[in-house]
Amino acid sequence: MNSRLIVTGTDTGIGKTVFSAALCHALGAVYWKPVQSGLEEETDSEIVARLAQASPQRILPEAWRLNTPASPHLSARLDGVEIRPEEMHIPATSLPLVIEGAGGLLVPLNDKTLFADLFAIWRIPAILCARAALGTINHTLLSLEAMRSRDIPVLGVAFISEANEDTETTIAHLGRVKRLGRLPLLDDLSPEKLHHSFARNFHIDDFAGVAR
């Protein structure tokens, strides 16, 4: 079955790319980052290729490659272009597909459209990546409300942080959302340790066979 999943987050730097790499490896999935902001350092596609140990055929080219590491709307403006969401079409593939957003859920693509608006059009099940640190209950519940107000299918929340049982349980209960698991912070972020950590902390059946 051809599975398609969106990986988004409550904030930038939340760990979406590392989680996406682990998920791609576990599912044998193709990875697509529609918008890449910042090209001087290792891009998210390059990080996923390295950590997922994915072949070049499983890393699809970005729809927009922008030079400045900033919000997509600003990065595009500095590059003298405008991101046109209507030109971003979901790639066809016979393999599972993991789509990673840029920054947080409500990051603007241009002066009219947020990433969440694009996800609402696509109607693909989304995984919300969140911390379990102080302040995350508010951030995560607000993100869930924003997703549901747009009828974005929510697969569940994936925590990427040190353990905080009360916070994780509270979010799952008040947010009426599935707690998919928690990816701990790894001192040695090698492909092998990442794959092992994901396998220990998540159930692959929660992700496999999701199709829209």
Curated annotation (Swiss-Prot):
- How does this polypeptide assemble, per the annotation? Homodimer.
Functional note:
Catalyzes a mechanistically unusual reaction, the ATP-dependent insertion of CO2 between the N7 and N8 nitrogen atoms of 7,8-diaminopelargonic acid (DAPA, also called 7,8-diammoniononanoate) to form a ureido ring.
Chain residues that bind ATP: 13-18, 100-103, 160-161, 184-186
Alphabetical list of Gene3D superfamilies matching this protein: P-loop containing nucleotide triphosphate hydrolases
Work out whether the entry's keyword set contains Hydrolase: no
The record's InterPro entries line, in alphabetical order, gives: DTB_synth_BioD, P-loop_NTPase
The gene it comes from is bioD
What are the binding positions for substrate in this chain? Answer: 37
Instruction: Identify the residues that bind Mg(2+).
Output: 17, 100
Q: What's a Gene Ontology MF term here?
A: ATP binding
Q: Does the keyword Chloroplast apply?
A: no
Known Pfam families for this protein? AAA_26
Look up the record and report any one GO term of the cellular component aspect.
cytosol
Family under the similarity heading: Belongs to the dethiobiotin synthetase family.
Pathway membership: Cofactor biosynthesis; biotin biosynthesis; biotin from 7,8-diaminononanoate: step 1/2
Record keywords: ATP-binding, Biotin biosynthesis, Cytoplasm, Ligase, Magnesium, Metal-binding, Nucleotide-binding
EC number(s) for this protein?
Answer: 6.3.3.3
Organism encoding this protein: Brucella abortus (strain 2308)
Q: What is this protein called?
A: ATP-dependent dethiobiotin synthetase BioD
User: Which Gene Ontology biological process is one annotated for this entry?
Assistant: biotin biosynthetic process
Q: Where in the cell is it found?
A: Cytoplasm
Give the reaction(s) catalysed. Answer: (7R,8S)-7,8-diammoniononanoate + CO2 + ATP = (4R,5S)-dethiobiotin + ADP + phosphate + 3 H(+)
Q: Which domain of life is it from?
A: Bacteria
Question: Which principal EC class is assigned to this enzyme?
Answer: ligase
Needed co-factor(s): Mg(2+)
Organism taxonomic ancestry: Bacteria, Pseudomonadati, Pseudomonadota, Alphaproteobacteria, Hyphomicrobiales
Active-site residues are 33
